[in-house]
Amino acid sequence: MTRRRAPRTPPQAALALALAALASLFFARPARAEGPGLTWQPEWRRAGPADYILTSALGAANLGVGLAFPGEREPSWTGRNDFDDGARDALRLRSRGARRWAGITSDIGWIGLTLYPGLVDSLLLATVAHKSSDVGWQLFVIYGESALTAGLVTVATQGLVGRARPLVQECGPGGEYDPHCGSRQQSRSFLAGHVSMSVNSAALTCVNQAFVPLYGRGAGGPLACAAVGLAAGGVSVLRIMADKHWASDVAAGAALGLATGALYPLALHYGFGGGRGAASAFRLTPIAGQGTFLALASGSF
């Protein structure tokens, strides 16, 4: 008997609504004096009309792309490779219950990490704890641009590529192996959306604390960066353990998350050097070699 699944709320719609809800909290707060210890440095580009237009356009594009590419029940890419097969054999959980809990845990981590820069860094720390609504708003706009860009690229890539999730290999006629069996979600493997959004938020948190002393000027910032980085890494591994993504999907998602979470705010707002008010000296140094290109992040915290 074929099970009828309830329609899923598109994650792009949820992200756009969450951003709108968080933004309303900034406007709902009464005006108050700025805290003395948290200021937006003159050399950092401030959010302006172009950023607001860009963020609105990105939000609309996320909704549009989500509707245009809902996924296909017949994946267009079913190819495999030794790297993906080896990682799957090593990490995939054999028990359906264990895979289910791995998936639920990764969902919780993904949601928490996706909201973290906007809810914790921008609202709770900058606006409430440090009493600096100006810095909080600047951080929130950067968060919106970064998260919505990552979401848009993720959903568009999933819809255009149409790669089969690894779990499709195990789906029998009844689809008991996984709830995604037979659904449109089974063709949204590349790239890993949980990973791209989680790594995006972790990278953005690390960049924010490197420039703005949200966690103080001691070990708080590096510890927060390490914590969200480990959490994002955990989400990445759990997606393979739950048989939701191939390892190459996870690697691509992590690369996108790093680009949108770190390079995006550096290029558009902070610049690639520590300002006068920076909580640390932060540098991104390109390293080129034969067949490789790396960006080395270095700094003193």
Model-assigned labels for residue ranges:
Residues 115-118, 269:
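Transmembrane helix recognition focused on a "late"/terminal membrane span
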Residues 91-113:
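Interfacial helix-start motif at the membrane-water boundary
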Residues 122-129:
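Conserved, well-structured interaction surfaces
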Residues 84-96, 177-182:
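Extracytosolic (periplasmic/ER-lumenal) interhelical loops and adjacent juxtamembrane/interface segments
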Residues 51, 82-90, 249:
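Acidic side chains
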